């Protein structure tokens, strides 16, 4: 739904800028009406969209393409983007809960099928595209090789909530790590579902409000000079 609202919003704004604004501009030019700063800005944007829309479209396409290319092929860039997103309010929780759900569910399945933990971590590191969690997997393998506990890599790590850490510790100490990982996956899957639903409920009215404000400003900008035009006529 948010995607539909976004497309609809952009469509409405473009329609107003391309078809509505030029009609008012023509009227004001014919009457020699004085134009204020806000109206001039809206007119300039409208003119740019009509005459150079392909430039704006090209810039957007190239920007998306370059960013996608860098994200896919440059590890440092991908890690930086992920680090940035994982420190944003709400977005951080969405990413962490999703990663923990995938990790714990897959890890539980591997353990139940008697896959060695080092091999499991290697598999998990290849499944995730998140560089932060890849590093945790690599560190876990190193710790196991050194004779340390699995949970040592998860201890005090900012990307691992305390609940997840203590459940891993419990599973490790009781010898029921697979069962505990199942519980972790169920818990964080529900957490992820709830936060995504809450985010959708928040975004939808915000987008509608933003559209209303933008459209209102555009309409106000093109109507204000009309009052000056009426005064000139009188």
Model features per residue range: what roles?
Residues 92-202:
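Glycine- and small-hydrophobic-enriched helix-loop-helix hairpins
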Residues 1-69, 190-234:
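Bilayer-spanning, highly hydrophobic alpha-helical transmembrane segments
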Residues 55-75, 110-126:
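Alpha-helical membrane-embedding segments
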Residues 89, 114, 225:
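Conserved functional loop/turn residues at catalytic and ligand-binding sites
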Residues 25-28, 39-42, 46, 82-85, ...:
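Conserved protein kinase catalytic domain
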Residues 29-33, 66-87:
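Juxtamembrane helix-loop transition segments at the membrane interface in multi-pass membrane proteins
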Residues 18, 39, 75-78, 134:
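Non-catalytic, surface-exposed connector residues within folded enzymatic/regulatory domains
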Residues 33-43, 81-98:
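Membrane-cytosol interface motif
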């Amino acid at each position: 739904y948010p995607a539909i609202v976004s497309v609809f919003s952009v469509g409405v704004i473009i329609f107003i800028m391309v078809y509505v604004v030029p009609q008012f501009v023509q009227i004001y030019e014919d009457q020699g009406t004085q134009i204020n700063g806000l109206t001039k800005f809206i007119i300039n944007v409208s003119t740019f969209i009509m005459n150079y829309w392909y430039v704006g479209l090209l810039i957007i396409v190239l920007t998306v393409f370059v960013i996608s290319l860098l994200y896919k092929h440059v590890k440092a860039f991908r890690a930086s983007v992920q680090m940035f997103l994982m420190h944003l309010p709400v977005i951080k929780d969405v990413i962490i809960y999703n990663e923990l759900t995938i990790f714990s569910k897959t890890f539980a399945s591997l353990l139940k099928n008697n896959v060695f933990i080092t091999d499991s971590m290697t598999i998990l590191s290849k499944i995730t595209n998140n560089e932060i969690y890849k590093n945790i997997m690599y560190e876990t393998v190193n710790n196991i090789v050194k004779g340390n506990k699995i949970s040592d890599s998860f201890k005090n790590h900012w990307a691992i909530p305390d609940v997840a850490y203590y459940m891993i510790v419990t599973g490790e100490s009781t010898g029921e790590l697979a069962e505990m990982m199942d519980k972790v996956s169920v818990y964080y899957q529900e957490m992820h579902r709830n936060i995504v639903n809450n985010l959708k409920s928040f975004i939808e009215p915000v987008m509608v409000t933003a559209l209303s404000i933008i459209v209102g400003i555009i309409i106000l900008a093109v109507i204000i000079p009309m009052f000056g035009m009426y005064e000139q006529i009188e």
